[in-house]
């Protein structure tokens, strides 16, 4: 008993401890599986926060704004390049997704309000919580003031908006996680991670980018050691078959490798290059050594180079190859070229532009030598450019302050929408100007994970006590109506996207579905399962549209319920 009183006092006086405790317990809960269902750390944090909130904790709402801004800015920054590339007629499906969910959400709310005789305040609250669109509280409350009702009745209805929101918000946050992360992959019969890799490979024009710890089973470049059977060939002759002789071992000693070096019978040669070229050249040289000496190994690096040398600008790849002598190119392989947000295959007639990023592959000394000829190495710094990203967040929050009025209805992106838009813009800019705005993937991942889990934990700590109390007072009916409002529009939109819009990629589809519900917690779990930022592009499009459409539901529910 003394321990419980101590914990209550501790958490009430130190809400920051309650916040981190909710996150820790939530991610622990999120690890458990119930059949094929795993709620994940974000939903777990929300449940843990609701449980902790029962002791009565006050936590500042400003913290929730900051955490969500960090989360959504990082999401926008990761997906900015692909987002702007996707805008156009090809994004029509995402627009339709957002409209279908908003319309089906409106009719679902009106149906349950009529069937169960909810007043306008409770109906609007169920819409706000069940659809997890907090802005509906504001627009519905403003609409209630325009009805000309007595002040006491207006205030009562506005209070009912908050009650309906508090009761239904928690499951409203869980529903899109369950549907997007568990039910949608079951419907599509494909996993999020597999389709995320497929979509990324298509965006990269066949050049797949693998997640941490993932590598292709069939590597494009290989190293093999062969024992020479017949003497007489020079290194230059061997390398004419598009391979590189990296090491020569004669008897028990390594010898210097030059273009004029002549190999002798019994020499061990370390060949490096494309798999097919190495195998075909090696078979002509002699027998492959299955267990080569350790001193023959070399370290291979892969680096991006920002092309700034004017001697290469405007030239084709073939012309650039001629400018770079064979000696300068020795041992270096060009993997690809990135221009803005597009990855281009290195064909002989492709013309080079200033600012292109070329990916080189070879030994460190060879890559460094060629990089000096082309421009400058783009080193992967572990430092985050906080000047760049601090300005980005300021710009986003300022955008969120802008209010446009549609009649009596105030429309605003809010801090979250503003930070998302700013993240998209700054991510796009950084992609085109790689020297500034660096943010390591680990740093942006931390912002996404901590920002989102912290946001939902603060929400749970703020509304959890009221939600449980209201359920006790109002009964389970209101909660179940929220379940219906949360699930039915998502199911309708999911089926519409699958069978009418013909979505084929599970990761892209999941992002679009989560965005059409403005379901930020669901996005976090989708990104966790996908392992890359592919779902964010479709999410960003539907989220921006849904943020406006769902906000407009407040006055419509008040008018027609």
Curated annotation (Swiss-Prot):
The keyword Zinc does not apply. It is found in: Cell membrane. Pfam families: Asp-Al_Ex, TrkA_C. The keyword Cell membrane applies. It is a multi-pass membrane protein. Coiled coil: none annotated. Signal peptide: none annotated. Keywords: Cell membrane, Membrane, Repeat, Transmembrane, Transmembrane helix, Transport. It comes from the Bacteria. This is Uncharacterized transporter ZMO1681. Belongs to the AAE transporter (TC 2.A.81) family. GO terms for molecular function: monoatomic cation transmembrane transporter activity. NCBIfam families: Asp_Ala_antiprt. GO terms for cellular component: plasma membrane. GO terms for biological process: potassium ion transport. Residues 205-287, 294-376 form the RCK C-terminal domain. The chain crosses the membrane at residues 10-29, 34-56, 63-80, 95-117, 122-144, 164-186, 386-403, 407-429, 442-464, 479-501, 538-560.
